[in-house]
């Protein structure tokens, strides 16, 4: 997979390649993750014509897993760069709000980095972090650097 864009915040990770949303994973079912999840489910409804009720938050530990496993196994990514762009902006706004109000953000970043290292070992993690470092144009400055610092301090 050629990763060209990644968005991360303490509750959720989104990977986008060539404008197609490929995968999202909620790490924690906190309020921020729920907000981002709603945006993702809305996009899914729009693209696949699926009922939003299909993705009820109480149905699984990670409400997005069931939906995204369907995409991964079908081999058909969501093909809507417009929706993906809107999701990026909303997730980054939620991230900025969360970090400005949370003293625990660095600890959460460190745990997310550990998760990423296990899931995407080797040079892939560097690629993900480097994409995070290029988010200043949309308001989430130096996310990659914050992740590295948090991991070093852990």
Curated annotation (Swiss-Prot):
Residues 93-103 are annotated as: Single repeat region. Residues 1-19 form the signal peptide. Keywords: Host cytoplasm, Secreted, Signal, Virulence. Disulfide bonds: none annotated. It is found in: Secreted; Host cytoplasm. A motif (RxLR) lies at residues 38-41. One of its GO terms (cellular component) is host cell cytoplasm. It comes from the Eukaryota. Changing residue 119 to I: Leads the loss of recognition (LOR) by RPP13-Nd. Residues 50-92 are annotated as: Leucine heptad repeat region. Its main location: secreted. Pfam families: ATR13. Residues 104-154 are annotated as: Highly variable C-terminus domain. Has the canonical translocation motif RxLR, but lacks the canonical EER motif, which characterizes most oomycete effectors identified so far. The leucine heptad repeat region contains five protein variants with 12 amino acid polymorphisms. Leucine heptad repeats are a feature of coiled coils where the leucines are embedded in an alpha helical region. Three of the different variants were recognized by RPP13-Nd, suggesting that alteration of the amino acid sequence in this region is tolerated. Belongs to the RxLR effector family. Secreted effector that acts as an elicitor of hypersensitive response (HR) specifically on plants carrying defense protein RPP13. Recognition of ATR13 by RPP13 initiates defense responses that are effective against oomycete, bacterial and viral pathogens. The allele ATR13-Emco5 recognizes RPP13-Nd, the RPP13 defense protein from Arabidopsis thaliana ecotype Niederzenz. The ATR13 effector protein is a highly polymorphic member of the RXLR class, yet only a small subset of the polymorphic residues appear to be involved in RPP13Nd-mediated recognition. Polymorphic residues of ATR13 appear as clusters across the surface of the protein. ATR13-Emco5 is recognized by RPP13-Nd because it has the critical residues Phe-73, as well as Thr-119 and Arg-148 within the highly variable C-terminus domain. This is Avirulence protein ATR13. It comes from Hyaloperonospora arabidopsidis (Peronospora arabidopsidis).
